[in-house]
Regions:
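Short glycine-rich or small-residue beta-strand-to-loop segments that form or flank ligand, phosphate
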Residues: 2-6, 52-54, 145, 229
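A glycine-rich phosphate-binding loop feature that marks nucleotide/adenosyl-phosphate handling sites
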Residues: 2-4, 34-42, 84-95, 148-154, ...
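Short helix/loop capping segments that flank catalytic or ligand/cofactor-binding pockets
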Residues: 4, 11-14, 61-63, 94-96, ...
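Flexible inter-domain linker/hinge segments
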Residues: 8-87, 91-99, 104-110
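Structural signal for hydrophobic packing residues in well-ordered secondary-structure cores
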Residues: 9-11, 18-29, 57, 61, ...
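Conserved N-terminal alpha-helix of the aminotransferase class I/II PLP-enzyme fold
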Residues: 43, 63-64, 108-149, 154
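Short acidic (Asp/Glu) and glycine-rich catalytic loops that position anionic groups and cofactors
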Residues: 43-51, 79-80, 106-114, 136-140, ...
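Conserved PLP-enzyme active-site core in the AAT-like
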Residues: 122-123, 153-311
Length: 311
């Protein structure tokens, strides 16, 4: 298991944890040799030697009020959810209301001890269990894991599941991952990290996946195809009219379809990924649901999978 520590943790807390573990496994603790640095020191090569904050903007405004007005003038140039719907294709955002975010600050939710016994975490367990069932129903896939701490980790976990499936079947050649140009930008990085070779699929003039180009690549690599990663609707903001046909093509050669959930907010309640051919997808709970956008984390990027890819 792993233990997460933050800036509030101290030397005594760490030694208490080590003592607890030592007693648990019935071994004597030897903490004398453990040394803790009291301060963090940057290597000299990492220290900046040139002058900083030399731009005029840092000397033009001499008072807090002047600087505040300058910052707000810059902010007025932005178009955000405060002004209207955001035409941003890579992530379908919405406003997460304060009423929905407020419970995150409750100590009963945010300050539970990681070693709390099960009989003291029944409420927390029910929240997770209920959310697992709801997400499974929303996306139309059998199982859900909350282990990934971000959407990018959800991508990685889903692709690892696909890779592990093929390895368990002895199909070690299935290392090709098809990714359309219209897919979310993180997809190629996740695929490479998971051990796949990326093949780029072209798009037509209207932003759809070029089905002819996809067909040519599928036919060429056939039993080497491991997965197709797509974003639906795409980063161009386009709902692929041939989505079922695309999924069927990948399945016909034994591959899996991975859906990037960045734009899932645009289809929740209208359709389910599992119903139109998706085998595994992740969800960004800060986009589709209402956990905070940033703020130091950790976030949640749950990944959902079909029965075939479930543990």
């Amino acid at each position: 298991f792993g233990i997460s520590l933050d800036e509030l943790s101290n030397e005594k807390e760490i030694k208490d944890i080590l003592t607890f573990i030592a007693n648990l496994i019935e071994k004597e603790e030897d903490l004398e040799h453990i040394k803790f640095d009291k301060e963090f020191h940057l290597e000299s090569l990492a220290l900046r030697s040139s002058a900083w904050m030399q731009q005029d903007i840092f000397t033009n405004y001499q008072s807090e009020t002047e600087l505040m007005r300058y910052i707000f003038r810059l902010a007025e140039k932005d178009f955000s959810l405060v002004d209207g719907m955001m035409p941003l294709g890579s992530c379908t955002m919405k406003l997460n209301s304060a009423a929905e975010l407020n419970p995150v600050s409750w100590a009963n939710l945010s300050s539970m001890h990681p070693f709390s016994p099960p009989d003291q975490t029944k409420g927390y367990s029910k929240i997770i269990s209920d959310l697992e069932k709801w997400i499974s129903e929303i996306v139309g896939l059998k199982s859900v894991s909350f282990q990934p701490n971000a959407g990018s980790q959800g991508e990685f976990a889903g692709l690892l599941a696909i890779n592990s499936y093929f390895e368990s079947k002895g199909e070690l050649l299935r290392k090709k991952c098809l990714i359309p140009k219209s897919a979310h930008g993180t997809n190629p990085a996740s695929a490479v990290m998971a051990g796949f070779d990326v093949l780029t699929v072209e798009c037509d003039d209207e932003g759809n996946i070029d089905y002819q180009d996809l067909s040519i690549k599928v036919k060429k690599f056939d039993n080497q195809i491991g997965a197709l990663m797509l974003t639906y609707p795409s980063t161009h903001g386009v709902f692929e009219l041939q989505i079922r046909k695309i999924c069927d093509l990948i399945h016909s050669v034994g591959g899996f379809v991975y859906l990037d959930g960045a734009n899932l907010n645009a289809q929740v309640g209208l359709c389910k990924p599992g119903n139109y051919g998706v085998d595994v997808c992740h969800l960004n709970l800060h986009k589709t649901f209402c956990i905070p956008h940033g703020g130091g984390g950790p976030g949640v990027g749950p990944v959902a999978a079909s029965e075939t890819l479930s543990p």
